């Protein structure tokens, strides 16, 4: 039986028209397409008309043609190959359905000339209705590829409609990102300054200063920050949100049963609070059997294990109630199932339930790795992470949990697959819950700074992503993958990228002052990043005419906002 390492059975696509530069394709940046997950009776027609590859099979319900996954694993149809070019990004889309079975995973796989399989995206397909499958590939070398459908069911029969592969240069992709950023991260604000009789105040001057950005690019910290004043100064001058790498974890705070020690975590939290830095909790429990306190796996009695686990949840969540922005309640509970094996299938869901009762206002994450990174293994795919969150929220008493998805983002030292990453974020975002990238890093490699910038911009340009935390720091911090500064706190190339993005994603302090006129043009309108602002209105000729107020610019207020200021004079 032919398979690849993950055990999925493959079915090769017969490429009917290999280089047709027209046809229907899905725009990976379209807001209407990005979160589309419903199953439809007939695939909708897209306004996009340019695709490198375009074909359909089995569009009609009564057709006998479909992609059949042969039980013997043999490939029964030869293919003409598609030529891909290094430096381009290829976005794949197809509407798929099952002719037999229901709710099975269907994915797209690219096989390169050297026999490597690149997982390109996946969905849960259904019978008798169509689901949109999206993904793609960013080739690290030029060459030809074969395109496959994959399924976890060897008997699957897959119908495909409007299969498309669309090519973007990196410049075109970034232009799309920038256009989307203008829509999802900014709003245009128009100021109207009038007297009480509603006549305009000509010559008024409006000054604007951002006090808090809506989107936060943060950085993890560890205990070494308590030992280095330079590390503390470096951190506080840059970041407004953090998480602690190990200091809140169970194996750190209770190394011996019954002997809790929160000294390091408390001290780090105090530093953060003194410097206006928000803290994201990591982690209450960890479902990996190898990541427990050394004494926990020695407990054989399930009742005893339940007691110490509940004590841990109560202890850490009560201690930090109201002090954190979020919690990884059961870390990596798609990859691992230690507590489920020991305490029952609903262990994770019940722990989220208890956590919700202890701190109902904190955001609670399902936090996983290899979800957006496009690794070979397929344990915590976007579909499975989405299903885990749905399972937790469906547990009795959990419907009002403030849920969120944590995509860790431990990328390999190679060109990231941005097309796959965007499709993965689409799948996760279809839940309607916020997504955070929580542990972004990458081993040292040539072009690390380029790849990290591409990853962070991809996340920032996706509407479902609400924040990012990188696992990085200066040399003294011990972060040996993403090292942002040397021992003298001089930036590395990757450090320069982070500083550039911090400046770009926080409203510049050099916002031009607005001078009110009686014209009908947009001189009084300014494009502002979402966030909190202090606004001052004054007049150069009327010294007593001055007023200040706070303003929050939000996505919910729309693309254009009007702020009316009435002057008593």
UniProtKB/Swiss-Prot annotation:
Pathway: Glycan degradation; xylan degradation. One of its GO terms (molecular function) is endo-1,4-beta-xylanase activity. SUPFAM superfamilies: (Trans)glycosidases (SSF51445). Its EC number is 3.2.1.8. Residues 209-500 form the GH10 domain. The keyword Glycoprotein applies. The active site is at residues 332, 439. Glycans are attached at residues 197, 261, 307, 346, 490, 536, 544. This is Endo-1,4-beta-xylanase 5.
């Amino acid at each position: 039986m032919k398979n690849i390492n993950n055990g999925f059975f493959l079915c090769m696509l017969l490429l009917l028209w290999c280089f047709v530069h027209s046809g229907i394709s899905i725009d990976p940046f379209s807001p209407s397409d990005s979160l589309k997950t419903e199953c439809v009776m007939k695939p909708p027609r897209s306004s996009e008309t340019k695709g490198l590859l375009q074909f359909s099979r089995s569009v009609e319900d009564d057709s006998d043609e479909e992609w059949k996954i042969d039980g013997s694993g043999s490939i029964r149809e030869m293919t003409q190959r598609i030529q891909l070019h290094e430096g381009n990004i290829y976005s794949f889309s197809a509407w798929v359905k099952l002719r037999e079975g229901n709710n099975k995973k269907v994915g797209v796989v690219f096989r390169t000339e050297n026999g490597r399989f690149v997982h390109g995206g996946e969905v849960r397909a259904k019978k008798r209705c169509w689901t949109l499958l999206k993904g793609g590939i960013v080739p690290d070398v030029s060459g030809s590829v074969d395109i496959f459908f994959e399924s976890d069911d060897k008997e699957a029969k897959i119908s495909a409609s409007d299969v498309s592969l669309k090519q973007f240069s990196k410049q075109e992709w970034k232009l799309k990102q920038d256009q989307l950023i203008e829509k999802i991260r900014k709003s245009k604000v128009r100021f109207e300054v009038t007297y009480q009789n509603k006549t305009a105040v000509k010559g008024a001057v409006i000054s604007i200063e951002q006090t808090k950005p809506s989107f936060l690019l943060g950085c993890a910290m560890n205990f070494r920050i308590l030992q280095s004043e330079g590390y503390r100064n470096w951190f506080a001058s840059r970041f407004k949100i953090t998480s602690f790498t190990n200091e809140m974890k169970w194996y750190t705070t209770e190394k011996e049963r019954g002997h809790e020690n929160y000294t390091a975590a408390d001290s780090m939290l105090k530093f953060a609070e003194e410097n206006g830095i928000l803290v994201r909790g990591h982690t209450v429990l960890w479902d990996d059997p190898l990541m427990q306190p050394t004494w926990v796996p020695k407990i054989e009695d399930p009742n005893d294990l339940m007691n110490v686990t509940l004590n841990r949840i109560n202890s850490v969540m009560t201690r930090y109630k109201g002090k954190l922005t979020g919690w990884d309640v059961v870390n990596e509970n798609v990859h691992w199932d230690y507590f489920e094996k020991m305490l029952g299938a609903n262990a994770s869901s019940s722990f989220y339930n208890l956590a919700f009762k202890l701190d109902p206002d904190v955001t609670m994450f399902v936090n996983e790795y290899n979800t957006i990174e496009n690794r070979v293994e397929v344990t915590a795919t976007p579909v499975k992470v989405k299903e885990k969150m749905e399972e937790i929220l469906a547990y009795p008493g959990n419907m009002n949990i403030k849920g969120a998805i944590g995509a860790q983002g431990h990328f390999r030292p190679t060109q990231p697959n941005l097309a796959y990453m965007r499709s993965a974020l689409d799948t996760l975002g279809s839940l309607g819950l916020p997504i955070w990238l929580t542990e972004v890093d990458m081993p040292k490699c040539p072009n690390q700074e380029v790849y990290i910038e591409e990853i962070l911009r991809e996340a920032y340009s996706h509407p479902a992503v609400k924040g990012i935390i990188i696992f990085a720091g200066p040399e003294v911090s011990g972060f040996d993958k993403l090292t942002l500064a040397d021992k003298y706190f001089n930036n590395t190339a990757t450090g320069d990228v982070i500083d550039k993005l911090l400046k770009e994603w926080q409203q510049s302090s050099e916002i031009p002052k607005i001078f009110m006129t009686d014209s009908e043009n947009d001189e009084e309108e300014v494009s502002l990043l979402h966030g909190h602002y202090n606004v001052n209105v004054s007049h150069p000729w009327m010294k007593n005419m001055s007023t200040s107020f706070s303003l929050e610019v939000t996505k919910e207020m729309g693309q254009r906002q009007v702020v009316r200021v009435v002057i008593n004079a």
